[in-house]
């Protein structure tokens, strides 16, 4: 896995040399809004940081097509709280990744908007940290093992809008192609039943979910 970024960089350098086009380096910094698909909660409520460096290679003489490679630090996770009558919980976890996105870009004829799509490889550098607490109402996750898998392969959709000269506003969506945590067990309330003495008692069932990172990033890019 450690040779993947080097191989991608070599491909970009080869394309650049053959086309004799410029490489535009850039810095980027922004925030992520993320959730974990499969944790039984909804909403992009976990806020984290994303930032790093990258390079955009022009693949055509009119600069309409390009390819970019980035090296980023990104935070993802999930956060939600409730103290209603039926749901009593707090859920706040965050994971740190080093990621290498590779995107193909198309630029509009006026040069003000750049759209991209591609893939990203993320390496988990810090396991999810935070707190998970649930009262036994309706659903309860197994918190004995919060370990996530070390690799995250994501699909990426990207849009950049020029603000002024080399300054751009970037919106990016990413979703895991493979699970980052498998078979997370949840107990959930499944109604009532009668025990051997005829008393009505709660009935609980279990389910297991595979989990996927789902995030939206809002970034500023300064391109040289």
Where do the language-model regions lie?
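Short glycine/proline- and aromatic-enriched beta-strand/turn motifs that initiate or cap beta-hairpins
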Residues: 20-57, 133, 215, 219-224
